Amino acid sequence: LTLLAGTALADETYVTVYNQDLGMIKQVRTLNTRPDNRPLRFTDVAAQLIPASVHLRTLTGGSNLQVLEQNFEFDLVSSEKILEKYVDHPVEIVTEGGELVSGTLLSRKGNSLVLKTAAGIKIMAFNDKLSIQVKELPQGLITRPTLIWELAGQGAAEEKLEVSYLTAGMNWQAAYVGILEDEGKSVDLKAWVSIDNRCGATFENAHLKLVAGEVHRAAEPRAVQRMLKAETMAEEKAAPQFEERRFFEYHIYQLERPTTIKDNQIKQIALFPDVTVKSEKKFFYNASRDPKKVEVRLVFKNEEKAGLGKPLPAGIFRLYQKDQKSLEFIGEDQIEHTGRNEEVKITVGNAFDLAAERKVIEQSKVTSRSQRQTIEIELRNNNPKQDVTIVVEESIYCGDWQIESSNFTYVKKDINQVEFSVPVKADGTAKLRYSLLCRW
């Protein structure tokens, strides 16, 4: 006799989802572990379970239970598997016309079946118009992924066990929706988390945690590969109930109520209440990204006085703006994990009325290990009503460098980047010119 431990018998289920196609599952069961109920079979585990990560321990005091052997069985029932196991065994086939053909299955390859019948060898086209009957399920095939343990020790009729494991096929990311107000001076922000479960198991009434941060993982091949199936999407519109806290060098978001995470489902839950954040629309020119275009970005500080001040997990930030009676999509960008008091820059798109052109107008050798360049950047504003300031981002890779002169103020951002702020009048043009000395 074996004991089947299914999801319905779960005392508690804990699910932790990472940003890296990884989930941590912990389930507590009260099971009969006495010798007459062994081996112990534990079903409804994730199909993409990582076997080497499985950990079984007893929570019952005084128990002497020990694990001698562990097996992860994932040879699941399918028509292909059944026929594969029935090679050299008798089968019965009913054709489209109702004819019964009995014989020994010799081969099932591609779109054909080869049978040895009393009349000889028969080759039949394999399609959905055939009905194939077999006596029983072949040994070794199972209906659900299963963990099987061989145990030592006396055990108990009611022993509380904790099973934990890692699984591939689980992911989450944040999704942000921002509605621009007052010409970009503020943004109404909604934040969601999207949990994508394709691990091959459903977790009922689970205690959910999300880990924001990059966990280092060793390069190890997955134990099981699965085809992606059709997915459903569930959206939870209730008030946000995530508690956020620091954990090691990461951030954890814990849902304060149980939730069911179905297999092949994307679940969306509000991350925090809607907020209005002070923001600024800025224009940037970076010739290394696009030599002709000027980008428009929405910039805000992730701080309390701006209306936010919360750790922002990595995700896609989508922006909308009102046009008369409707909202229109104006652009999206990917943001990285962003801590409190850090600046967020969202590239919305290219400014239609702004253009730029960069030229090296002079270049001379100063010494055998240095040279001087004069660079000119022309910025054009074709909007007849709006003055703008364009931030010019210049990337410099020439060892030791020095800006000898510039007709606009600049800030050295780091060892390889400098920024110039250039005001451009409506329907006007401005030229940035600076001299660069490079040494190597």
Residues covered by each model-derived region:
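Post-signal-peptide, soluble extracytosolic/periplasmic N-terminal scaffold domains
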Residues: 9-188
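Short acidic, flexible loop segments centered on an aromatic residue
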Residues: 18, 47, 55-61, 166, ...
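Low-complexity, acidic Ser/Thr/Pro/Gly-rich terminal tails and inter-domain linkers that flank the onset
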Residues: 18, 166-184, 341-369
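Solvent-exposed beta-strand/loop surfaces of large extracellular or lumenal domains
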Residues: 19-22, 58-83, 131-139, 212, ...
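Short beta-strand elements of extracellular/lumenal beta-sandwich folds
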Residues: 27-39, 185-198, 285-286, 290-305, ...
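Beta-strand-rich interaction surfaces with strong enrichment in secreted/lumenal proteins
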Residues: 28-32, 80-82, 150-151, 177-179, ...
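Intrinsically disordered, low-complexity Ser/Thr/Pro/Gly-rich interaction regions
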Residues: 207-211, 227-365, 390-394
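C-terminal soluble interaction/assembly domains
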Residues: 356-440
